[in-house]
Amino acid sequence: MQFIDRAEIEVEGGKGGDGIVAFRREKYVPAGGPAGGNGGKGGSVVLKAEENLQTLLDFRYARRFKADDGKRGGPNNCTGAMGKDTIVEVPCGTVVYDLETEEILGDLVKNGQTLCVAQGGKGGLGNKHFLSNQNRAPEYALPGLEGEHRNLRLELKLLAEVGIIGLPNAGKSTLIASLSAARPKIADYPFTTLVPNLGVVRKPTGDGTVFADIPGLIAGAHEGIGLGHEFLRHIERTRLLLHLVDVTSADPIADYEVIQQELTAYGRGLSDRPQIIALNKVDACDQDTLDLIAEELQQLSQSEIFTISAVTKTGVEELLQAIWHRLDQATSNHQDSSLPLV
């Protein structure tokens, strides 16, 4: 399935039903008063978070959503039926913007959470409301009001607790495939991963934690170079970043610094996010070189450093134990966190 994480849609609430002009016509009431009912309220357009959706792909084909109009009032002071709401399902993690004002209207994080994005119009008043001492038989009523109209931008930010970052070909997809049931495309060339991959990794307790393999970042990603700019926002919600460094690259230290610079340039607190560094592909590196890389990185970062092989799973269990520990710390420090365990 194609991964789409941005879409623009048009939403419109239903028009309110018209009020009507009517009079009482009982057999023994020769001078019956006004009895025109009010129009029904128009339906609203409501976005609803759905955990089984993973992409905004559907909005490439359906971009306009309108709720039903309210019904006109009836005689005998009967109010018209309300218009039916239009419910539009979106993936959990969808941020909703007003396209004209750039105002954030809502952030749909939890399954079943709803957000009304276009209110239905109010129903018009029937002639019964215009009865007065001066006018005992009003011959007019009000039409229903138009529904609210908006153009929206939807942006999906994945709900993952651990974001796996690193340069292209650092082994991110291999790692997430070895840890979970996710089966991303894996090949020995840069930019194999073109979309984020999600995998659920089980703790010894049986609880699951969502890991996100973010497409490889390169220098200038925050300015739109490469693939990173489109996907940096997907790690905004993470509690922990797992930074993979390929020890077989020409300059692993420079690789690490490139990613750190991109996190800082992107902003939104990403450079301050708790981080664990994993030196990957140790099965293809001699011990002396590995020790030298680890020593240099330790001088640049206060993050824990682990040595692993995503292919042979060497060191992976120790890495996972450290991740669980850091997440438990984050949970105890942020009991109000909205990121769900799966």
Curated annotation (Swiss-Prot):
Name assigned to this protein: GTPase Obg
Family per similarity comment: Belongs to the TRAFAC class OBG-HflX-like GTPase superfamily. OBG GTPase family.
Residues annotated to bind GTP: 166-173, 191-195, 213-216, 280-283, 309-311
Pfam families membership: GTP1_OBG, MMR_HSR1
Cofactor: Mg(2+)
Domain Obg: 1-159
Function text: An essential GTPase which binds GTP, GDP and possibly (p)ppGpp with moderate affinity, with high nucleotide exchange rates and a fairly low GTP hydrolysis rate. Plays a role in control of the cell cycle, stress response, ribosome biogenesis and in those bacteria that undergo differentiation, in morphogenesis control.
Organism whose genome encodes this protein: Crocosphaera subtropica (strain ATCC 51142 / BH68) (Cyanothece sp. (strain ATCC 51142))
Assigned EC number: 3.6.5.-
Any one cellular-component term (Gene Ontology): cytoplasm
Any one biological process term the GO annotation gives: ribosome biogenesis
Residues holding Mg(2+): 173, 193
Family annotation (InterPro entries): G_OBG, GTP-bd, GTP-bd_Obg/CgtA, GTP1_OBG_dom, GTP1_OBG_dom_sf, OBG_GTPase, P-loop_NTPase, Small_GTP-bd
Entry's localization field: Cytoplasm
Record note on quaternary structure: Monomer.
Highest taxon listed in the record's lineage: Bacteria
